[in-house]
Each structure stands twice: as C-alpha cells, then as structure tokens.
Amino acid sequence: MLFKTIFYQKLQKKVTTLFNLETERVIREIENLNKNNPKVIFQAPEGLKLKVEKEIEKIKQYFKQKNINIEIYLWGNTCFGACDLIDNHVKNLNVDLIIHYGHEKLSYANPEIKTLFIPAYHIFNKDEEEKILNDIKNFIEKHKSGGKKVAIATTIQYKKLLKDFNPSIILGCRGEVKEGDVILFVGTGRFHPLMIAYKYQKEVFIYNPLSKCFDKISEEEINKFIKKRILAISKLLLNKPKKVGVVLSTKKGQCRKRVFDEIIKLLEENDVNYLPILVDNISPDILFYDVDCYIIVACPRIVLDDYILYKKPIYTPEEFKLFLKNSFKYKFDEIKEDDF
C-alpha cells in the first residue's frame, strides 16, 4: 500500500489540471481483473486522446514497477459518445477491459466486454469554482426576481461541480431538460445547447465555465434553422423521390432498429423504392448510391449539423414522416430508449 500511495502522489503532480482521469480507479479496475497479462483498450473522444495517451504511459509505468505484464492499446478511431462503443470491433482480440473516457453509460447501449466509464470531470481551482458558481447563482437570482424559474443543463464533465443546482445532463443526441421558464446551459461550445434549442424551440442561454462568459442561442437562429429544414422537406413534395437510401448505423447506441423497421414499412405502404444501407461511421464520402435522398437512422445530429456537406439531401426519420404526411409542423428527432 505504501508503494501505491507514493506512486499516486507522484502521479498527482504530473496529472492534467483540466480533467480528472481517475488514474487510481483505472489501475484498481485493471488489478481487479486478477489476470496475467490482461488486455486493456483505452477509448476517448478527440479532445481527450492526447491526455489519455499520457495517462497510458503513467499506467504502464505503474505496472512495470510492480513487474506485472499488461497489454494496453489506444483506440484510434472515433468516439462520438457513449453511443460509440467498440466491443463489437475488438471482441476477436480477447480484450479483458475497455476504459471509456468522457461519457457515462447509456441505458440503451450495453457493452458486451467489461467497460469502465470515466466521466473526466473538469478540474478548477477554488477561485475558479467560486467565480463560476457565483455567476450562475446571480443569473438564477436575476431571473427569479422576474418571476422566472431557471433550468440548468450541462454535460457530464461539469456534473460534479454543479451538483447543488441539480442539472440535467445533456447528450449530443438527446436534450432532456427539467422544467423551467429559462434554460441555462453550462459548458463549452454550441453543440449540446443547440440540441436543447432545436428540441424545445426556444432560446437557450450559455455560460462557458472556461471563459466565464455568457452567450445565447436566439429564437431567430432556431427559426432560421427550422425554415431551412422545412424547405428541404418541401422539395420532396415537389419532386417525390423514386428511390430512397435508408441508412442504419451499426453503432450500438445509434442502431435504432425499431425506427428503421418503421421507416421501411412506411416506404412500402407508400410504394417508394428503397435501398437499406448498414454503416458504422456515416459520412458524405460513403453515400454515393443511385438514390434521390437518404434517411439517416442514427444520431440526428448527422442531419441537423452536417446536411450541407452531403451531395444528396439527407433527412431524419421524423422529417421524412412529415413529407409522407404532407405536414409542415416541424418535429425534432432524437434518440429514445424504445428506438432499439
């Protein structure tokens, strides 16, 4: 135990000041395998890959000093979220453990190989924490004085910091927010708050805990986006597609088989020819088929964020249903537990 304590004290001096990668927990999980020469794969999103690379070196050093053999690999492909599990990709390697950084386990995506999820909580010093929490409290009080309730949303990295505000945890593909008159998203970037804005079709305030600045996604921006998507749907009404590509992601947390089957049934009922396509990573360069458009049965953000990159029109399942119903009442598509 003394050796382990001294080792962790040394690690703490070197470890990143931005994210808590829970080195001790990872080492303990590997040791608990109680296996000679265990195989462990580390998986992380792009923003954490270089930090995890350094983390691997520290963990290798620990086991080397204990004279324990271990095989460690870094997953080099994508990691879009807890939906993007790799157990099916690596099962032929007889892997004992996967360390997945940056996300929490999804109830509808269960890995078949033992997987440890490390949230990678953001680390702030005391002054930074105080500044962040006071800024949020002042925002809440300001709107409370006007008779409005503020709902706080954030990503997993700030869950621990904001625990006293009981925040909703937002995923890229889902935007469930507790009831409130005003929504404040705490986090970096616009990817996650856009999800909330699209779903609730109302402005979302943003507080960036790194820059300590406020921003917002306006109703004007949301309405502009919805108009673009309705225009895309209306083009289907003007030129009814003769053949449609129906793309189903094979990623465990995006493989919405029930939705896929529902779309196929609707196409058959409406006498529309279709080509079912199975894909892991959906991107513009692999959708080159002789179809008029594609229905993307996967993460809805592929359509909502990247539609302009595709040569042929792409639609979410909900958008294509609007076309079949001849409706212009836009309905946002998001992944739900009963999609699988």
From Swiss-Prot:
[4Fe-4S] cluster binds at residues 83, 173, 299. Keywords: 4Fe-4S, Iron, Iron-sulfur, Metal-binding, S-adenosyl-L-methionine, Transferase. Binds 1 [4Fe-4S] cluster per subunit. The cluster is coordinated with 3 cysteines and an exchangeable S-adenosyl-L-methionine. GO terms for molecular function: 2-(3-amino-3-carboxypropyl)histidine synthase activity; 4 iron, 4 sulfur cluster binding; metal ion binding. It catalyses: L-histidyl-[translation elongation factor 2] + S-adenosyl-L-methionine = 2-[(3S)-amino-3-carboxypropyl]-L-histidyl-[translation elongation factor 2] + S-methyl-5'-thioadenosine + H(+). Pathway: Protein modification; peptidyl-diphthamide biosynthesis. Its cofactor is [4Fe-4S] cluster. It is an enzyme of class 2 (transferase). It comes from the Archaea. Its EC number is 2.5.1.108. GO terms for biological process: protein histidyl modification to diphthamide. Homodimer. Catalyzes the first step of diphthamide biosynthesis, i.e. the transfer of the 3-amino-3-carboxypropyl group from S-adenosyl-L-methionine (SAM) to the C2 position of the imidazole ring of the target histidine residue in translation elongation factor 2 (EF-2). Unlike the enzymes in the radical SAM superfamily, Dph2 does not form the canonical 5'-deoxyadenosyl radical. Instead, it breaks the C(gamma)-S bond of SAM and generates a 3-amino-3-carboxypropyl radical intermediate. Belongs to the DPH1/DPH2 family. NCBIfam families: arCOG04112, diphth2_R. This is 2-(3-amino-3-carboxypropyl)histidine synthase. It comes from Methanocaldococcus jannaschii (strain ATCC 43067 / DSM 2661 / JAL-1 / JCM 10045 / NBRC 100440) (Methanococcus jannaschii).
